From Swiss-Prot:
Membrane topology per record: Multi-pass membrane protein
Polar residues compositional bias, start-end: 512-525, 888-902, 911-921
UniProt keyword terms in alphabetical order: ATP-binding, Glycoprotein, Membrane, Nucleotide-binding, Repeat, Transmembrane, Transmembrane helix, Transport
Primary role: Functions in the engulfment of cell corpses during embryonic programmed cell death to translocate molecules that mediate homotypic adhesion between cell surfaces of the dying and engulfing cells.
Protein name in UniProt: ABC transporter ced-7
Binding site for ATP 1: G580, H581, N582, G583, A584, G585, K586, S587
One GO cellular component, as annotated: plasma membrane
GO biological process: apoptotic process involved in development; establishment of mitotic spindle orientation; left/right axis specification; lipid transport; phospholipid efflux; positive regulation of apoptotic process involved in development; positive regulation of distal tip cell migration; positive regulation of engulfment of apoptotic cell
Domain ABC transporter residue range list: 546-777, 1379-1603
Gene that this sequence comes from: ced-7
Summary of the tissues where the protein is detected: Ubiquitous in embryos. Expressed in larval germline precursors. Expression in larvae and adults is seen in amphid sheath cells, pharyngeal-intestinal valve and phasmid sheath cells. Low levels of expression are also seen in gonadal sheath cells.
Amino acid sequence: MNRLRQFSLLLWKDWVLLRRNKVWTLFELIIPCLLLGPLVYLVVKNADHTSSPENIYDNFQVKGTVEDVFLESNFIKPIYKRWCLRSDVVVGYTSKDAAAKRTVDDLMKKFAERFQSAKLKLSVKNESSEEQLLTVLRNDLPMLNETFCAINSYAAGVVFDEVDVTNKKLNYRILLGKTPEETWHLTETSYNPYGPSSGRYSRIPSSPPYWTSAFLTFQHAIESSFLSSVQSGAPDLPITLRGLPEPRYKTSSVSAFIDFFPFIWAFVTFINVIHITREIAAENHAVKPYLTAMGLSTFMFYAAHVVMAFLKFFVIFLCSIIPLTFVMEFVSPAALIVTVLMYGLGAVIFGAFVASFFNNTNSAIKAILVAWGAMIGISYKLRPELDQISSCFLYGLNINGAFALAVEAISDYMRRERELNLTNMFNDSSLHFSLGWALVMMIVDILWMSIGALVVDHIRTSADFSLRTLFDFEAPEDDENQTDGVTAQNTRINEQVRNRVRRSDMEIQMNPMASTSLNPPNADSDSLLEGSTEADGARDTARADIIVRNLVKIWSTTGERAVDGLSLRAVRGQCSILLGHNGAGKSTTFSSIAGIIRPTNGRITICGYDVGNEPGETRRHIGMCPQYNPLYDQLTVSEHLKLVYGLKGAREKDFKQDMKRLLSDVKLDFKENEKAVNLSGGMKRKLCVCMALIGDSEVVLLDEPTAGMDPGARQDVQKLVEREKANRTILLTTHYMDEAERLGDWVFIMSHGKLVASGTNQYLKQKFGTGYLLTVVLDHNGDKRKMAVILTDVCTHYVKEAERGEMHGQQIEIILPEARKKEFVPLFQALEAIQDRNYRSNVFDNMPNTLKSQLATLEMRSFGLSLNTLEQVFITIGDKVDKAIASRQNSRISHNSRNASEPSLKPAGYDTQSSTKSADSYQKLMDSQARGPEKSGVAKMVAQFISIMRKKFLYSRRNWAQLFTQVLIPIILLGLVGSLTTLKSNNTDQFSVRSLTPSGIEPSKVVWRFENGTIPEEAANFEKILRKSGGFEVLNYNTKNPLPNITKSLIGEMPPATIGMTMNSDNLEALFNMRYYHVLPTLISMINRARLTGTVDAEISSGVFLYSKSTSNSNLLPSQLIDVLLAPMLILIFAMVTSTFVMFLIEERTCQFAHQQFLTGISPITFYSASLIYDGILYSLICLIFLFMFLAFHWMYDHLAIVILFWFLYFFSSVPFIYAVSFLFQSPSKANVLLIIWQVVISGAALLAVFLIFMIFNIDEWLKSILVNIFMFLLPSYAFGSAIITINTYGMILPSEELMNWDHCGKNAWLMGTFGVCSFALFVLLQFKFVRRFLSQVWTVRRSSHNNVQPMMGDLPVCESVSEERERVHRVNSQNSALVIKDLTKTFGRFTAVNELCLAVDQKECFGLLGVNGAGKTTTFNILTGQSFASSGEAMIGGRDVTELISIGYCPQFDALMLDLTGRESLEILAQMHGFENYKAKAELILECVGMIAHADKLVRFYSGGQKRKISVGVALLAPTQMIILDEPTAGIDPKARREVWELLLWCREHSNSALMLTSHSMDECEALCSRIAVLNRGSLIAIGSSQELKSLYGNNYTMTLSLYEPNQRDMVVQLVQTRLPNSVLKTTSTNKTLNLKWQIPKEKEDCWSAKFEMVQALAKDLGVKDFILAQSSLEETFLRLAGLDEDQLDTHSTVEISHSTHV
């Protein structure tokens, strides 16, 4: 039932996506119906059944004499004209039997005598061997470009394989020269045994040209000569032949239409096939692995996609097939319906099969394009005859081939006028491949593709799949070739340990609760840092739902040890935090726990179930929120939750309640029916958290759940996690240390794949902490450096060992050691006295006079106290681990130097190279920025042009898959077509020789029409030969029965009648079926054999051999067929070349690297012109290769100039259109698919539709012209393909000048050029600022309904600095400030996102812009960086309007980097665009400053998130500008790397003339970097000032933490605190059994730090607790209050700045 529920859910999901993806629905359903609809309508309308004319043929004679040469007959070329009226011809001959040479010479002498007259002299010439004869014949053939004559001197050659007069045996072959215009069909039996005639009006068949080539007359002459040699005196009789009459056949447009079904439905289903391939590949990339962890069945995943795609096909089927069933004859509707539906199902399964190989949509689309085209080509090229049953079975393994065979079987029944239905579909299966067998093969295809898709998916989803895993399903035990992070004993699991793990595993399986008593030691942490693991007896006995034992994960592709012997336990009721630097192995650990990847070694149990052995059971208990957002853009919030809820198998009746509770908790309930694509980044993360929690998952894995969220949103999620953890086990990773501190009941710290520390926050801080942090804000009027020195002296006077920390603008930090805590109160009293300017206070009595005299110059505005954070602890632990690993590494290297046989191994993720950053490199960067770029004007434009060319070249070189499909595949496809013209057959090639024996026309019926007792001897012998052969069925008829009646009675019979014999006016006539290609020469040999009296063992057999000028004798395919293939192949080839151009444009734009380039000041004209020129050069190079191929294959040799013109026109008409429409798409793969559909599918369908309409129906010429003109204008591929067909058709008879006439190719060229001009004009128009501004306004109005902002608090104190800032902006000169924003307003419809914003940022200032999601930050940044236009107001950078082409340094929220460039290349390209002369040195300097030298030459796609952010920061610092804008510059970076970025930005602020403006969701970052901070709410500025000023003005509480000695103290301490501090609020929940209790104490106006700290100190001493903490409101709390999200209003958890506890 659970599988069926999954299937229904997935089907529902696909249905919802179908309804909302209107563009795809248009292409998948409406366009095929529009293409097929008119055709079906015309077919049905013209479905009147008519009868073809009855054909009765006259007889003719083959005499084997000169009379045959000059015989004239209607509609057939006489022999002598083929010989160009030559009077002397030669026939060469040779005998393979030397003993029969004299006999052969005599026979050929008689042969020559038969062809002597006044008009013709035929001579014979003997050659020594067959090879010699062939050489002579080939050399004698005329050159095709010299004459149209088929021969020179030699008319033919004869090879006698056996001549035995005694035994009456003759076996020979006639050798004929092949001409291009002649078609012999040597590999085929008949062209169409049944149905209406194709119009044979001649009594003598013209194809194959047995008569015209003189084959028949030479054959009869040779055999008659042999008869005279065997039977002297035998009469020389002619053979009278007559074609069997052809009866009237019923005909209609339906039968003709059905013949084209394989091509029509291949085009129609192509869109469905592409779409299912794209959708599955897209989901394989992100969503499917996530849903699999939630319990998704792979089979149901593919089944749902296939069923939905099939249902879409079914809609098209209903529109196109059902109407045909009402006008069809002979074939039951059920048979046709089942056939087409089976094909549709097989086609979509083929798309799913191809998609199973990929998790990248671009590669999948290219693969399906080639694969589907190949399947169609194979089905067209290699189709066997229906009577070749074994070949048909092999051919039917291709779904298109099986469908073609089924259609051919249906057409066969319709032509035979026999009833076909599902009950008789296997009839005549022994004679030909029936419809039944075709359907069986389609079922086989469906099965093998379905199984193949599941197998390939299983292999691909084994994330670390290698060939070794096919044969080794156990974890490797030999680690000698594995990189080692620390020591061998930590990761090499010996047999004793392995057995112990197995025993404990058995215990868990027998008793799941036994897992709670297992406590694996944290050997890793203790082995690196002594005492880094806290011992907690209560936790050891708690129930652990997650147990990880000795987890090892080694990526076989790189050898990197991602996780190295990790062991941990996460217990129920707690939120366990997993911390680590980027690349430490956190995500790999999560994926292993969730069962997404398979560990190399170790064991993981979830709720007592083994992840490796019982994945189904474990997935029922897991809820996961990965780092990325596994969301469907077109599903709403509630629909995502419904999908995940159902996959988890939870009770459906509880869904609504569960969903509403979770959405309400994270403040997302108002977005319940909003699509995911319209959600902000923070909202998407909230949704992912809810997806992890819904369905009562017992184990919840949250991988950076709050990444990208603003503090308010983070608080919502934290509150939810705190509430939900009571009955769950939550394991969470984060880079926000304050979040880890707030949520973490237990903290695990990883480094280099190992667990290096674990314990509570308090334990880790106590073990690795540094002290308290005193933050003082100095007044702007004084000398801040002098005041900083005085302040430091004051602090060291009262608190020994106090140290000066960092200084941010007017804000200075002082580090106070924890051990000196008792000295804090006097220090606070002194600072309060200084702030009040009370210099006579008693607190200064012991202060030295020199220092006391300077107190008046120390002007303080405010101060506050916080404690060292968990972030500082994390950095300290990381430094200690690095030192420990380096020490062990050095020790190992020393050991290896003594034992060279052991290789030196390097831990994954560990870099022993020291940091290259230094003050010297920072200063060099500042000096470079001060000098500015050296190039300007034309020189800068040239540099920009070169950089774009380099960028595109690097992209092309790295994208081998794209280059392969864009360049190599088109060349290969064209080469394959060309190779068909060069493939030749040798002497034994089956395509050049055919044996003309009776078996070639078996099985067959024979019309035997004689009166009883009047059968001549010759006919009697002929009948004996037939019966001896066994493959003929003789049907006896009376001569009174007319032949037309006989053939009419045989309509549809199998096998058909091919030969016969009758008496007509006392003359014996041989009858033959005109539709069988090789029946005439076969029949003549059989008759001459019958004339040999005395024995039926006589044998006469002939054969035909075709030779050509070359030694390989003949082409495999005629040139006409090559010409037919060339046009559609060129359409496909040029579509593949040009449509791929769009992918780079969209990828560059969507990743915002294009925007980064525009921020260098480059003109859009320069930018796109360079890109267009590069694409033109690449296109030209490809066309040059095509030109060489055209020359090599002699295609359109005389009209190559016209061909090249159309190549140019195709580029000119299609590429500007591709550039213009690229702005409509966000997905490169979707754009590529739609363009391929436009260029190939729709154009091909248009070609096919026009062909069918013109061939089947009669419509007015003016309507034809309009239809063709519309297609040619809107479809350049159609015009191009039509021109190629015209050149192929008329190129041999018309000169180039006439080919370019309007009626031939001129119209195509003009319409393609017109479309190109229109497309280019549209593209240029889109580059104008006024057009983009207009489109932006239209777009913003459209999006206005998606905005929502929290209400603003009404009780906040007014910040006077806001009005002061407005006044300053209106009076300041914009050129004197780095940035001036004056009355900036941006409206979206009725919603105002930015409301008259006024700001001024000075040089050397770091300005922070804060606000919740929707407050206007992103909109402001978009206006400043030119991504959108303001509705009113202005913004000036360095005195210039931001809408101008100016240089801006910008680090966006999401890394604007091209994945296929290296970090170095990205910086070099942008530096060159900025105009730096030595751009490589500039990029090197940036890499030095951001610490990325070691990774500079790695592709961006292989960077971690932190490494990408470093490069993005480097890109911002690269710009020679007065303004650097940073949007969350350290998001996703681990704390250590974050501090390094801060250091660089601080240096930049202090030592350059540039100003910094940033926004961040990390309040620590804002405090560390910003000299001023502004807060936005509802688009308006509500507060501005330094961080301490904002905290002092808006901070409204303190946080007190008391640490207990034992749990039984809790109730007593809580009660006493409530008594002593009645206004305090306990924030530690009763379900949390921690010994650290937190209270929130409201801040009052009269509070001062000295009194408050002294009071808490006394309270802690009276209560007898172990430790205490008192801290002020954090900046985050202040921000939340300003945003209306503080705890007093929202009842959320405290967010205070604490980290360390001190002893009483």
